[in-house]
Amino acid sequence: RDARTVSPTEGCSVDEATEVLRNIARIHSRFWNDHRVPSIGDIAESVERWGPPANHGWIALAERYGSKAGDALAQFEWVKDNTLAWVEHRAGSPQTLAHGEFQPENVLFTNEPTGKNVLIDWQFGGAGPGICDVAMFIISSLTVEERRTHEDSLLKTYHDVLTADGTFDYSFEEMFFDYRAAAAMTLFKALLKAGWTATPGSRSDIFEISDALFERTLAAAQDLAPVEALKEAMARNRA
């Protein structure tokens, strides 16, 4: 009864983020490489579906934020032009039950001392890399300063819970590389949100949401070089 959601602009506290990551880590661990989890479907169909929104979003993003982005704008453009790359990477990475839209609005937070939280809105749930959920949540839920300060400890908490039962081998170093590559998906999400600012009938706070997400993903692009990591991951997969 005391559960609440938070807005994308407000985000959540670091302590709340820690407990959310513990929660999703337990889910990811439970369904790690579980073939019963439905896949995302045909790759070509996914690319065809996401291409037009990406192009629409790119026009809006470049116009609204181009002067702020500097050299990092090229990473957003690359993500727009290479939908196939990140869809293939998503399909070829270690699979688990991924939420697919893991942002603060899709978590019910409580005031319980245990930090209990409930993950909601699983309409995009299915087989995918769990680290994509993690990257989306950390980057979109925390301020730039909070992420930079606490990113490493949050990732270690997630990794410790994920691998606690020792049933699969996934080193922290491997996971951090995957986290960098997965951050490219947050750039794509920023494209989509920017596109909604140029779409009639969008929610009234879409400009504030888009501005906040762009600021956070821009910093992530500068800090993590996600496109570079994604390119390296694709080269490994195709070798």
Regions found by a protein language model. Give the residues of each.
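All-alpha amphipathic helical-bundle segments outside canonical DNA-binding/catalytic cores
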Residues: 167-183
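Conserved catalytic-loop position in the HRD/HxD motif
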Residues: 101, 121
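ATP-dependent phospho-/nucleotidyl transfer catalytic cores
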Residues: 4-99, 109-113, 212, 222, ...
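ATP/Mg2+ or Mg2+-diphosphate-binding catalytic cores
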Residues: 185-239
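Active-site activation/catalytic loop segments of kinase-like enzymes and analogous catalytic loops
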Residues: 124-166, 183-204, 216
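Conserved protein-kinase catalytic-loop position immediately C-terminal to the HRD catalytic Asp
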Residues: 105-106
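Active-site-adjacent bridging/hinge elements
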Residues: 1-3, 75, 128, 132-133
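Hydrophobic "anchor" residues on beta-strands that sit immediately upstream
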Residues: 95-97, 117, 129
